[in-house]
Amino acid sequence: MSWQAYVDEHLMCEIEGHHLTSAAIVGHDGAVWAQSTAFPQSKTEEMTNIMKDFDEPGFLAPTGLFLGPTKYMVIQGEPGAVIRGKKGSGGITVKKTGQAMVVGIYDEPMTPGQCNMVVERLGDYLLEQGL
């Protein structure tokens, strides 16, 4: 399965009538492997800062998580495994795998829990596959 198919079929799938706003799979080096059409244009530095937070949990807390034009307040995640952010009625979940980061962005009516489930389910699958 192509990386784009993982984004289209597993991240942008319908959950209880709702979808993520956008999603992507990004390499640890910050290079985007696949993304949905609405995924924000991001800088490599933004992705490498996210990666740094996995290596140094709490790195993003003072400044927030920036992705494209949006700044997310970093909230409780799983150190070294999952980063979660909040912005108004929406937010972001990032799951680290062996080779990539799975990123999901949501807004109401999708809930944080639904976003976490979609992103972490694919991330766990990729980890099981050695990816």
From Swiss-Prot:
Name the source's superkingdom.
Eukaryota
Keyword flag Transport: no
Gene Ontology, cellular component aspect = cell cortex; cytoskeleton
Q: Which UniProt keywords apply?
A: Actin-binding, Allergen, Cytoplasm, Cytoskeleton, Disulfide bond, Phosphoprotein
Tell me, what is one Gene Ontology molecular-function annotation carried by this entry?
proline-rich region binding
Using the UniProt record, give the first listed, main subcellular location: cytoplasm
Extract the Pfam families matched here.
Profilin
Disulfide cross-links: 13-115
Post-translation changes: Phosphorylated by MAP kinases.
In the record, Phosphothreonine modifications are located at 111
Its localization reads:
Cytoplasm, Cytoskeleton
Show where the record puts the motif Involved in PIP2 interaction.
81-97
Question: What biological process terms from GO does the record include?
Answer: nuclear migration; regulation of actin cytoskeleton organization
Concerning InterPro entries, the annotation shows: PFN, PFN_euk, PFN_sf, Profilin_CS
What role does this protein play? Binds to actin and affects the structure of the cytoskeleton. At high concentrations, profilin prevents the polymerization of actin, whereas it enhances it at low concentrations.
Binding partners and assembly: Occurs in many kinds of cells as a complex with monomeric actin in a 1:1 ratio.
Additional remarks? The variability of the residues taking part of IgE-binding epitopes might be responsible of the difference in cross-reactivity among olive pollen cultivars, and between distantly related pollen species, leading to a variable range of allergy reactions among atopic patients.
Give the similarity note. Belongs to the profilin family.
Q: Give the protein's recorded name.
A: Profilin-11
Q: Which organism is it from?
A: Zea mays (Maize)
